[in-house]
Amino acid sequence: MRLEQTSWMEVREKIKDPQGIIMATGSTEQHGPIGLIGTDTICSETIASGVTSKANMYLAPSIGFTPAEFNMKFPGTISISAQTFKSLLREVTSSLLKHGFKYVLIVNGHGANIDPIKDVICLLYTSDAADEKRC
């Protein structure tokens, strides 16, 4: 179930029972001369979507804008700073937790996202935003 394809009332009903949500992260960058620019996001979203269908969970909108400065010489690459990515991920994750999702699973498809994701998870574990929920 894609979160963006449901109403807020449907979400409210679904998260009455302890419920998690899965979010895919990837990148928008080159993958060779014939590879798709969205490969990392497409792959992580495909995996996340498969899990959500089997686990009856929501799939959050994917985050495909991530640190990829090393690929900026290739047209079509979109890169944001690690700090911007961390801020975006933290705010999105905090929003989901505040609305009642018990946990957020992150399926990552881009190597440069690993450290920023770890940083955000550490911040959420030590903040009130997590409120005993887990990422």
What label would you give each PLM region?
Residues 1-35:
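Active-site and ligand/interface coordination hotspots across diverse enzymes
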Residues 4-6, 65-127:
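Active-site histidine-anchored catalytic micro-motif
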Residues 19-21, 57-58, 105:
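Structural motif
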Residues 25-26, 62-64:
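Short loop/turn segments at strand-loop or loop-helix junctions that form parts
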Residues 35-41, 73-76:
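Glycine-rich loop at the start of a catalytic domain that most often binds anionic cofactors/ligands
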Residues 40-52:
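Short catalytic helix/loop segments, enriched in acidic residues and glycine
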Residues 57, 63-66:
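Short glycine-enriched loops at secondary-structure junctions
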Residues 125-135:
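Single conserved hydrophobic/aromatic residue that forms the stacking wall/gate
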